[in-house]
Amino acid sequence: MYKAVFIDVDDTLLDFNACAAQAMQRGFAMRGEAYRQEMFPVFRRINLGFWQKIETGEITRAQLEADRWNTVFAALGLPHLDGPAFEVDFKRFLTESAVPIPHALETLQILAARCPLYAATNGPQIQQETRLAKAGMLPYITRVFTSETIGAEKPSPAFFAACFAQLPQLTPADILFVGDSLTADMAGGIDSGMATCWYNPQTLPCPAEITPTYIITDLRQLPQLL
């Protein structure tokens, strides 16, 4: 039915929250700062807000990297910490963290035997390839498309157009795009002419304005769509 699969990385193949919590904790430890679990939801909320602004084109990735941790530290009452310096360490620690989503590896193994798999992510190229390799997933992925290399972020049509330009043997209709984000993945995939599969493990409601082709709650449901 489909000749290829595009698949998101963070929160589709790798558990971003678990990886980010590990990286945040390591960053605090190297500074001799006490880390408490209730700090992570503050980061998660602020980080999500920054990424939503990136997806809508309101800010650049450079602005996120410059401002993200200063905003987090201000909210946590830790203004003495250097946000840009913490950003450098956080990204390094995140690159070393690869907590898989349940059943992600076995699903990739099944899918890769049927058609080419392409990762499509807004994460940095080396970071995402390193994390996928550490999780044992990279051998099953034909190519990793990242916004860093392409120069455009999902859900921008420019991101997907650049991917398609490197795959002349495929049309958008040949591709199933799998991801957890309704905006970056589903809306972006729909607007680019691909069939879409929303990975929705929390069974969240789907807004009327976005209509994925499929909705799954467990990655083990994915092979039956091919």
Predicted regions and their residues:
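Asp-based, Mg2+/Mn2+-dependent phosphohydrolase catalytic module
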Residues: M1-V5, A18, L105, Q109, ...
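N-terminal helical cap/lid subdomain that shapes the substrate entry/recognition surface
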Residues: Y2-P102
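Residue-level detector of secondary-structure transition/capping positions
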Residues: F28, N47, A112, L167-P168
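Glycine-centered loop/turn motif at secondary-structure junctions
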Residues: G32, G77, R114-C115, G136, ...
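Residue-level marker of alpha-helix boundaries and capping positions
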Residues: T60, A98, A119, L176-F177
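N-terminal start-of-chain detector that recognizes signal peptides
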Residues: R68, F73, D89-R92, P116-A119, ...
